[in-house]
Amino acid sequence: SLKGTEAAVSFSSGYATSLGVIASIADREDTVLMDKLSHASLIDGARLSGARLSTFLHNDMESLRKKLQHLRDANPSGGILVVTESVFSMDGDRAPLREIVRLKDEFGALLLVDEAHGFGVLGEHGAGLAEELGVSSRIDFQMGTLSKAAGVSGGYVACSRAWADVMVNSARSLIYSTAPPPALAAAALAAVEVIRSGEGKELRR
């Protein structure tokens, strides 16, 4: 409910989330188009998927448009997954999510946003940069880790029910990994409740 999606899937870590989610979405027939400064775990997830991996210049919307146009000209019906962080881990840049959403809609692509460094910090309820910019409902996959603002361990992806079912049945880093222990799951839920509460709002000021 915090992310405003139909469903969410939890993983043992943020890294496991990147691996499992991207490999569940894309395959050898698709292209993963990623911001050049995206986190290593996202790059590894794209490589594991077997999809073609391409990059666009960091936060450069003209570069993204040109790459999307080239991919659509080459394969009008090909699958494209655009990947970016919301707040970049190395330098703190914020992605221009409104522009990215417009472009992914224009070219019929899917969009994955890694909110690892936005979750718990940005937005009215701490849901992240997508919430702050009012574009959450237009992002196909919002993923992140619980090891930053939430202060625990684990990862998540928030998406449609249909895509969540795909991941539960195909994400190898989920299926073949031990689930978080009950104490950790309870701590994560408590942290999320603090983030979305009035106390969390005060702490973000």
Language-model regions, residue ranges each:
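Active-site phosphate-binding strand-loop segment of PLP-dependent enzymes
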Residues: 54, 58-113
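Conserved Walker B
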Residues: 37, 87, 116-117
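Conserved PLP-anchoring active-site segment centered on the Schiff-base-forming lysine
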Residues: 21-40
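Active-site PLP attachment segment
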Residues: 125, 131-166
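Short, structured coil segments at secondary-structure junctions
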Residues: 28, 49-50, 107, 138
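Structural signature of PLP-dependent enzymes
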Residues: 191-205
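Short loop-beta-helix segment that forms the pyridoxal 5′-phosphate
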Residues: 1-20
